[in-house]
Every structure is written in structure tokens, then in C-alpha cells.
């Protein structure tokens, strides 16, 4: 049986953020929703001290490449639908 690992890295701008506290509320909400809805690992990984920019990453494991791809694309859709942030860049990698 094969193991498939997927990662998704998303760079965001948070235009309405005036402080790190504002930014962290938006980022924390995104990460919590993704963890709860999709059972993935999630973390803020870059631009930690920049209040209008964030980089978040998500990871999941499955035995089916299609499941991993679908799940990470749904997470990207979730982030893109959030009115408090804008996706600047995204990178999806699948390792099997």
C-alpha cells in the first residue's frame, strides 16, 4: 500500500490588518477551520512579524493521491473565499 503526502503552502495578504494581533486572529481562524473541517496539520510558517502578510501551510497523508489532491484544493478554496484575506501565491505538492 502506498503512502501519499500532500502539502499546500499559501501566501496571503491581510489588507485590513493594522497590527500583529489583527493578523493572528485571521490566521488562527483559517488554521482552526481547516484543522477541524479537513483533519489536516496546519501552521503559519513565514512572515511571522509582518502584520499584513502571512504564509500558512497545510499537510495531509492518505493512501490515495486523488483524496489528497481534492482535500488540499478544498482548503485552497476555503482560504480564497475568506473576505479578510487575499491569496497572493499557492504551491501544492504531492509526494507518493
Residue ranges and their predicted role:
Residues 6-14, 20:
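Short glycine-/aliphatic-rich beta-strand segments at the starts of folded cytosolic domains
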Residues 14-18, 61-64:
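Structural beta->alpha junctions
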Residues 40-46, 88-91:
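A short linear hydrophobic-aromatic micro-motif
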Residues 23:
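C-terminal binding/interaction regions
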Residues 60-96:
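C-terminal structural segments of small proteins and small subunits
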Residues 5, 43-64, 95-96:
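Short, charge-patterned binding micro-sites
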Amino acid at each position: 500500500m502506498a503512502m501519499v503526502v500532500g502539502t499546500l503552502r499559501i501566501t496571503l495578504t491581510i489588507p485590513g490588518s493594522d497590527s500583529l494581533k489583527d493578523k493572528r486572529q485571521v490566521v488562527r481562524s483559517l488554521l482552526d477551520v481547516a484543522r477541524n473541517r479537513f483533519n489536516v496539520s496546519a501552521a503559519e510558517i513565514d512572515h511571522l512579524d509582518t502584520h499584513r502578510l502571512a504564509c500558512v501551510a497545510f499537510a495531509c497523508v492518505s493512501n490515495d493521491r486523488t483524496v489528497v489532491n481534492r482535500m488540499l484544493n478544498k482548503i485552497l478554496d476555503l482560504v480564497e473565499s475568506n473576505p479578510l484575506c487575499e491569496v497572493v501565491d499557492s504551491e501544492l505538492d504531492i509526494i507518493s
